[in-house]
Amino acid sequence: MSDGHRSGCPINLTLEVVGDKWSLLIIRDMMFGNRRHFRELLLNSEEGIASNILADRLKTLLAEGILTKAEDPTHKQKAIYSLTEKGIQLLPVLAQMASWGYRYLPVSAELGIRAQLLAEGGPKMWEAFMAELRETHLGVPRPRGAKGRGAGPSVGARLQAAYEKVVARRKKKA
């Protein structure tokens, strides 16, 4: 192809944007860990990303319109990263990848619990979680009666509670 891409295949083009070994992990940490500052992403990465790699991937994700960057209103010297709708639409991809990994690879109990719950919840749960992400990252209010708006805990809160429960159980055994 003359536009610098290997081919016009949608899978190839997607991999050219998020197919490196860090981009989807950064997006995962923003979605599931609500990590929105450079330092949070750097210091709380399960995989231990290097600062130069994080900076490079954030730059790419910004250029591709998957993230936005703004001055943090609570701290003028910090930037806050937000997912765009394009970034939020990657949730089903991450959920499917996590489900596949949970099914076929030796995942840890604490890091596998979210994958298990997302697989069990399916697209209905993903849509509810995407609505929560839109509220957090885009300022779009969730519909009345949605999970976390008077109808029980949010999907994000349920995923976090399940994770913390598994971590606590493992600590008791240790």
Language-model segments: which ranges?
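N-terminal helix-turn-helix DNA-binding core of bacterial DNA-binding proteins
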Residues: 9-50
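Canonical helix-turn-helix DNA-binding module
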Residues: 46-76
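Short, contiguous, well-ordered secondary-structure segments
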Residues: 1-5, 14, 29, 65-71, ...
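N-terminal leader segment of winged-helix/HTH proteins
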Residues: 1-18, 160-174
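Short histidine
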Residues: 5, 22-27, 37-38, 129-133, ...
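Basic, amphipathic "hinge/linker" alpha-helix immediately C-terminal to the N-terminal HTH DNA-binding motif
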Residues: 19, 73-97
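Extended, folded domain segments that form the structural surfaces/walls around functional sites
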Residues: 35-43, 86, 90, 99-103, ...
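C-terminal regulatory/oligomerization modules of transcriptional regulators
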Residues: 95, 99-174
